[in-house]
């Protein structure tokens, strides 16, 4: 097992503001999927990217989510989730992040 794989096994997703210098981490993590899916506004995209450039923990979380997205795309290509399901999932992810934060 490589060092990166061992680090991934030990890593747990950030919950809430984890860095006093970056109190917006919980909101960024809640919106990572909108950035990955290209579903955020240009203004939100710029804010998220700026935060990711400044916050190594959120950048790491983003990288893991990006890998998950690629894996799902490779295994489930061709089918798109209905809009209603995507919206319910987005709301649930936001609620989970807010509750934990």
UniProtKB/Swiss-Prot annotation:
Region annotation Disordered: where it falls in the sequence: 1-20
A molecular-function term among this protein's GO annotations: metal ion binding
Stated consequence of mutating residue 55 to A: Decreased inhibition of SigH; reduced interaction with SigH
Residues the record lists as binding iron-sulfur cluster: 25, 51, 55, 58
Substitution effect: residue 58 to A: Decreased inhibition of SigH; reduced interaction with SigH
Cofactor(s) it depends on: iron-sulfur cluster
Expression induction: Induced after heat shock (50 degress Celsius). Part of the sigH-rshA operon.
Residue positions, PTM Phosphothreonine: 96
Complex and partners: Interacts with cognate ECF RNA polymerase sigma factor SigH under reducing conditions; the complex is disrupted under oxiding conditions or as temperatures rise. Binding inhibits the interaction of SigH with the RNA polymerase catalytic core.
Function comment: A redox-regulated anti-sigma factor for cognate extracytoplasmic function (ECF) sigma factor SigH. ECF sigma factors are held in an inactive form by an anti-sigma factor. Overexpression leads to increased susceptibility to diamide.
Family stated for the protein in its record: Belongs to the zinc-associated anti-sigma factor (ZAS) superfamily.
UniProt-recorded name of the protein: Anti-sigma factor RshA
Species of the source: Mycolicibacterium smegmatis (strain ATCC 700084 / mc(2)155)
């Amino acid at each position: 097992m490589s060092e990166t794989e061992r680090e991934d096994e030990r890593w747990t997703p950030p919950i809430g503001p984890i860095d006093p210098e970056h109190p917006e981490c919980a909101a960024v993590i809640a919106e990572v999927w909108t950035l990955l899916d290209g579903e955020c506004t240009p203004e939100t995209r710029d804010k998220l990217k700026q935060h990711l450039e400044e916050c190594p923990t959120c950048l790491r979380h983003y990288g893991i989510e990006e890998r998950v997205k690629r894996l799902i795309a490779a295994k489930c290509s061709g089918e798109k989730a209905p809009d209603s399901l995507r919206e319910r999932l987005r709301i649930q992810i936001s609620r989970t992040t807010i509750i934990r934060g």
